[in-house]
Amino acid sequence: KACREHFVVTLVFPILQERKRHETEYLLEMLDNWCGQHQEKLEIVVNDWGTAALAAERKNFMVCLGILLNKRKKDPRMKYKQGNDALFRKNSLNAEFYRTYLKENFGIDRYEWESFGFPQIFPSGENSLHFPFYQTNTSQHCTLYAECVNGNRGAQDQVTDCPRYCERQAFLYPKQLQMMGRYNSLFALAPALFRNPAEMGRAYAAHGVKRFVLN
């Protein structure tokens, strides 16, 4: 349907669990075959190295580095820090040799970023910026489930039958931090793009952002 209506589709893959490996391989193979039959390229966003390796084996994908692999320090309390903050503006993707490694080994030359209320220096390439929410950290297993069942968010285990606690409950934090905990993540709000969208959009675009993703 998207192809008929001339929409470009991007598929975002979660962290690959071992029990989901064969299912993921089958899905990637099916998508690759479809792309070959229709002479299309499909953008795949990967969030772990296992999925990146599987996607790199196929020739009809444009592989993009997801936000869970594009690691950097993100915390609403950073604005209270004093001293030199220059190193917060860069991460590993600003190193050319690392981008070369990603391109040669996984075919990755597209990168997903998050707006988190702090200046960033973007590298060359296809950069996408997610806004206005960002993840400060993400656990492999659900911290909310661990708190509700075990009384300790650190006592995490793999959930096979989700009771959907997150529909009714969340971790709350002081209002000035503009953050909350839900699912296996902590989410925070960076409202700068909403306050002056035209000006902020032009500023980000001038510094290497090619696409904005409303989340």
Residue ranges and their predicted role:
Residues 1, 7-215:
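Active-site pocket-lining/capping segments in soluble small-molecule metabolic enzymes
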